[in-house]
């Protein structure tokens, strides 16, 4: 999601909160989903080591596709990389590859450039939980939301890329320049994993269940395209996306040309899926299923690393973290700092939760607002977006969910548990290899004052988070809207 759209989404949420449209937490039984089971598979897993390679792998897979490409994403940008990948998908469809894209509708308006592609006989695009408002911008969208919040609050947050049912990419990335290090303004530090093996069949079934459900509709039912103008809007957008971007396109092709064979690790992989019943009862199917499976695989962990862009507990209860601490586990949290967060709402609530976590002796690493990644094409500011949990440096969760109420109760998510010490060590290295350059270590000094330390730098005030933020943070807290975050 681009920064401009994130800001606009915040405006929409603000309007909804101001009008009093905040849902309450559902009643959840203590043993909810405790009996849910998933099948463990042997698979080959490859942690894609850089952001540019994550995009290059997708292009390479599309060019090699022979039969089918299935995808699910929360957002797909109309920018250089977003349009480049769509064009590659169109070329695959020209070779008789069946292309299916399920896309959340929150950020799709009257985007004829996208609906254009659905005219191709081998391309189908469906929108999840679509809005009625398409042409009135965010004001119309916000009004639509405020009058039908119970339905429209649920969003599709999965990120899924499957080629020929043989190769699959999962992780936290949506599709756009800023997810792969190619934005000139700001980028996300994120993660993707490439899979091969029998586990993909389970994701095939999950994809088909959503594709066939009442919750998705063909894009051209909502965005009308004239047959005589076939591909005109897409071609125009593609030309605009390429304009003055020759160096970026050349660099992407160079990345593809120099791709090595993936260094796969053999591992036991267990898929975790959400339930579409969540759209009716808002219960935390995915969160509970994931935690139950973790307990089965690691009953008494001694160490846990939790990586999430947003750390907002459900109903102010850190149930998962408290359970770890009760078992004497050392808990490390890696998340955004107040200044590095791409959400205008999260810092307002995270401020108090930081203190609670420090009270629990959680080790906290906060991402710097001016963090620069050496593998990004443009060395600009970045936002932390990695979503993973690692138990005992052995069992690793990789998926689409954040550590917040929205992922628990409102969004549809997916993920996997990977049982492999070698893979877990790779993930920890991936997250922390630039530790001093990218993170503040947050703790309390002897007097009890909160401090942020990085190398020889010591801060006693929230780094790069000015007093100008205090008023909006106060207003956001008064709205009591954590359930929506």
Residue positions per predicted region:
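Bacterial N-terminal signal peptides
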Residues: 9-19
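Charged, low-complexity intrinsically disordered terminal segments
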Residues: 21-126, 130-156, 163-485
């Amino acid at each position: 999601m681009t920064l401009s759209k994130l800001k606009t989404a915040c405006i929409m949420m603000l309007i909804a909160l101001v009008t009093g449209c905040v849902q309450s937490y559902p009643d959840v039984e203590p043993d909810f989903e405790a009996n849910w089971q998933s099948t463990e598979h042997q698979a080959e897993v490859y942690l894609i080591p850089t952001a540019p390679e994550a995009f290059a792998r997708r292009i390479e897979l599309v060019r090699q596709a022979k039969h089918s490409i299935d995808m699910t994403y929360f957002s797909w940008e109309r920018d250089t990389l977003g349009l480049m990948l769509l064009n590659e998908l169109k070329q695959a469809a020209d070779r008789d590859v069946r292309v299916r894209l399920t896309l959340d509708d929150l950020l799709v308006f009257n985007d004829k450039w996208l609906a254009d592609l659905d005219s191709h006989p081998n391309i189908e695009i469906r929108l999840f939980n679509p809005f009625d408002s398409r042409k009135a911008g965010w004001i119309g969208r916000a009004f639509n939301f405020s009058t039908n919040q119970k339905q429209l609050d649920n969003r599709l947050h999965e990120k899924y890329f499957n080629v020929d049912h043989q190769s699959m990419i999962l992780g936290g990335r949506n599709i756009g320049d800023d997810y792969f290090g190619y934005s000139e303004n700001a980028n996300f530090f994120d993660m993707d994993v490439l899979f091969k093996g029998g586990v993909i069949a389970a994701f095939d079934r999950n994809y088909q269940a959503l594709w066939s459900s009442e919750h998705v509709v063909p894009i051209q039912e909502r965005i009308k395209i004239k047959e005589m103008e076939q591909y005109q809007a897409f071609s125009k957008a593609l030309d605009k996306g390429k304009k003055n971007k020759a160096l970026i396109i050349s660099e992407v092709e160079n990345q593809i040309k120099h791709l090595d064979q993936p260094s796969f690790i053999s591992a036991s992989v267990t898929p975790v899926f959400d339930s579409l019943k969540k759209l009716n009862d808002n219960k935390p199917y995915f969160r509970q299923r994931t935690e139950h499976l973790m307990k089965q695989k690691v009953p008494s962990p001694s160490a846990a690393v939790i990586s999430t862009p947003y750390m907002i507990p459900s109903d102010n209860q850190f149930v998962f973290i408290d359970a770890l601490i009760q078992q004497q586990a050392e808990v490390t949290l890696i998340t955004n700092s107040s200044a590095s967060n791409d959400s205008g709402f999260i810092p307002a609530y995270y401020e108090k939760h930081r203190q609670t976590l420090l009270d629990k002796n959680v080790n906290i690493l906060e991402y710097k607002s001016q963090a620069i990644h050496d593998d990004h094409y443009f060395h600009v500011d970045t936002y932390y977006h990695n979503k993973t949990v690692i138990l005992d440096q052995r069992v690793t969760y990789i998926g689409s969910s954040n550590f917040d109420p929205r992922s628990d109760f409102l969004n549809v998510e997916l993920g996997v548990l990977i049982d492999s010490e070698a893979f877990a060590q790779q993930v920890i290295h991936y997250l922390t290899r630039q530790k001093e350059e990218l993170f503040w270590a947050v703790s309390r000094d002897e007097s009890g004052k909160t401090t942020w330390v990085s190398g020889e730098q010591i801060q006693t005030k929230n780094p790069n988070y000015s007093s100008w933020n205090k008023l909006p943070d106060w207003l956001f807290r008064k709205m009591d809207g954590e359930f929506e975050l």
